[in-house]
């Protein structure tokens, strides 16, 4: 089995490169499916029975009542009851090209933040050898190289609004994804993948057939990606 290089090996390879350059099925089970808390990544899509008989009616969509049921779990930063203005394509999905451009634009707007990874912060870049001794780069140049390396291996979470459908309230939830269309390692080989998730509490319209069909709103835990990591 091919082993994935560790971050340490990746960073060492980069130092070597820099040194060289510097040197010279359907059924009733659908009725009971709902998102469940899970640490398994990547997250899977929801599966819903297509029959509209299981959809909530207009009288079941009283926003005042639903907001009361959800209580303090309502998060306006990640939830919306109507299509958000910044949601690409409005009610429908954007064309592939437009979606790619929007994703790339969001990626370019993000920069590494927080504490610099210790593997990068501890790197000692060498200008080459002079009389058998390593000469350190200036503090300013060393910082620039560290920031460049950090930006190359940075794996931000890209957020976009997702329409869960009429059987969920709020209907629109902001979900995260990892940008995996380019390698995040030097040399190439590793990509950004989900590493952590958190859960939002939303309401789901659930129907049961015990003693006749009965439906109602229940709170469920909806997982979203919260962190991405450069890995195999």
Swiss-Prot record:
Q: What happens when the gene is disrupted?
A: Defects in Nog are the cause of a recessive lethal phenotype at birth. Multiple defects include a failure of neural tube closure, broad club-shaped limbs, loss of caudal vertebrae, a shortened body axis, and retention of a small vestigial tail.
Q: Keyword annotations for this protein?
A: Chondrogenesis, Developmental protein, Differentiation, Disulfide bond, Glycoprotein, Secreted, Signal
* SS bond list: 155-192, 178-228, 184-230, 207-215
**GO biological process terms held by the UniProt record:** anatomical structure formation involved in morphogenesis; atrial cardiac muscle tissue morphogenesis; axial mesoderm development; axon guidance; BMP signaling pathway; brain development; cartilage development; cell differentiation in hindbrain
Residues modified by glycosylation: 62
The cross-references to Gene3D superfamilies, in alphabetical order and at most eight, read:
Cystine-knot cytokines, Helix hairpin bin
Q: Identify the stretch annotated as signal peptide in this record.
A: 1-27
Keyword Mitochondrion set for record = no
In which compartments does the protein localize? Answer: Secreted
List the InterPro entries.
Answer: Cystine-knot_cytokine, Noggin
Region Disordered: start and end of each range? 77-99
What GO molecular functions are on record for this protein? cytokine binding; protein homodimerization activity
The cellular component terms of Gene Ontology attached to this UniProt record, alphabetical and capped at eight, are: extracellular region; extracellular space; presynapse
Any Pfam family: Noggin
Summed up, the tissue specificity of this protein is: Expressed in condensing cartilage and immature chondrocytes.
- Does Glycoprotein show up as a keyword for this record? yes
> What family does the entry list?
Belongs to the noggin family.
Assembly and interaction partners: Homodimer. Interacts with GDF5; inhibits chondrocyte differentiation.
What this chain does, per the entry, is described as: Essential for cartilage morphogenesis and joint formation. Inhibitor of bone morphogenetic proteins (BMP) signaling which is required for growth and patterning of the neural tube and somite. Inhibits chondrocyte differentiation through its interaction with GDF5 and, probably, GDF6.
Question: What is this protein's record name?
Answer: Noggin
